[in-house]
A protein has these predicted regions:
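Post-Walker A alpha-helix
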Residues: 22-23
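NTP-dependent small-molecule kinase module
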Residues: 2, 140-141, 155-205
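Short beta-strand-centered segment that lines the nucleotide-binding/catalytic pocket of NTP-utilizing
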Residues: 31-44
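Conserved phosphate-donor/acceptor-positioning beta-strand/loop module used by diverse small-molecule
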Residues: 99-104, 113-138, 168-169
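The conserved Walker
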Residues: 13-15
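Extreme N-terminal, non-catalytic leader segments
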Residues: 1-8
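Conserved lysine of the Walker
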Residues: 19
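ATP-dependent small-molecule kinase phosphotransfer cores
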Residues: 42-99, 105-109
Length: 205
């Protein structure tokens, strides 16, 4: 079924907060939504498909598109560039698809400061300790990399107030219900005391 009023939803979270899991669960049962496919200058990893996981382009092509104003947001991460093409969003809107845009705070602030209409959600972990445990349980990062992600998380959580909605991902099933409620009703009561407690925990750990 086509969506007559497609929308853009921007989702951000510290690494380990469970953002990817929530998005994946939501998309698996909502066919009118698609995950935005970013353009990047980094080479494909094993198993990645051009146009599915990313749009892989050269540095020169990226620079050309940037000069043309083709991106709604872009950033440099670990010596590679990433960006969201306006043409991709427009194409999906014409098809009646709403877009889930999974980006960091830096990218979101570019969109927030533009005239692009969107609804935004920031996902918080229940505590600093739980965030670190989730990162360690992945068993994919070195201790140094985990510490770097935790340091980044401290910076990122301070921007939660810039977003329209905040979800505390303590229980996945409850979090996905809240996620869906926000997407479909634009309504969610924020427990400010809980948010402040989490922030104090993360910033003072």
């Amino acid at each position: 079924m086509q969506n007559n009023h497609p929308e853009l939803f921007v989702i951000s979270a510290p690494s380990g907060a469970g953002k990817s899991t929530l998005i994946k669960k939501f998309l698996s049962s909502n066919n009118n939504f698609e995950l935005s496919v970013s353009a990047t200058t980094r080479p494909p990893r094993d198993g990645e498909v051009d146009g599915v996981h990313y749009q892989f382009i050269s540095d020169d092509k990226f620079k050309s598109l940037e000069d043309e104003g083709a991106f709604i947001e872009f950033a440099q991460v670990h010596n590679h560039r990433y960006g969201t093409l306006k043409s991709f969003i427009d194409k999906k809107f014409v098809q009646g698809k709403s877009i889930i845009l999974d980006i960091d705070v830096q990218g979101f602030m570019q969109i927030k400061n533009s005239n692009i209409l969107n609804s935004s959600i920031f996902i918080l972990p229940p505590s600093f300790k739980e965030l670190k445990k989730r990162l360690e349980d992945r068993k994919s990062d070195t201790n140094s990399a985990i510490n770097k992600r935790m340091a980044n998380a401290r910076e990122e959580v301070q921007y939660y107030g810039e977003y329209d909605f905040v979800i505390v991902n303590d229980d996945v099933e409850e979090a996905i219900k809240t996620f869906e409620n926000i997407i479909f009703t634009k309504n969610h009561s924020l427990n400010k005391n809980l948010i402040e407690k989490i922030l104090q925990d993360m910033l003072s750990y």
